[in-house]
Regions:
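Local sequence-structure signature of Cys/Sec-based thiol-disulfide redox active-site neighborhoods
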Residues: 1-23, 27-28
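Extracytoplasmic thiol/disulfide redox context detector
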Residues: 1-2, 31, 100-101
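Thiol-based oxidoreductase modules, predominantly thioredoxin-like and allied folds used
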Residues: 31-42
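Acidic pyrophosphate-coordinating catalytic loop
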Residues: 43-49
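Structural micro-motif
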Residues: 49-57, 69, 73-74
Length: 107
């Protein structure tokens, strides 16, 4: 399983997202390294399909799913609709994505 967190420098939510993701992985018994990727320019944002900071991907898939909005990639904060703290992916979203990825690896 490949786990990545993409972020812009000085993102206030990046450290918390990584910490929560580590806790989810630990609780699920998955000893995997989290690759943290700093996105520092617009070209990189476009190449990485970066939808804002922080973005969590597992096996290359955005845990928030694919957006129905027109694609716009930029150096910006990310908003997670329905989250208690809108700048962080909900823990439940992380748990679901980790479980789904693990299930896909065992089938």
């Amino acid at each position: 399983m490949r786990v990545e967190v993409f972020y812009v420098p000085n993102c206030p939510h990046h450290p918390t997202a990584v910490s929560q993701l580590k806790a989810v992985l630990r609780a699920e018994g998955i000893p995997v390294e989290i690759h943290e990727v700093s996105v520092t320019n617009t070209k990189a944002a476009q190449e990485l399909r970066f939808r804002g900071s922080p973005t969590v991907k597992i096996n290359g898939r955005d845990i928030a799913g694919e957006s129905q909005e027109p694609e716009s990639f930029a150096l910006a904060c990310r908003i997670y609709a329905g989250a208690k703290e809108v700048g962080l992916p909900p823990i439940e979203m992380m748990q679901s994505a980790v479980r789904e990825a693990r299930k896909g690896e065992t089938t």
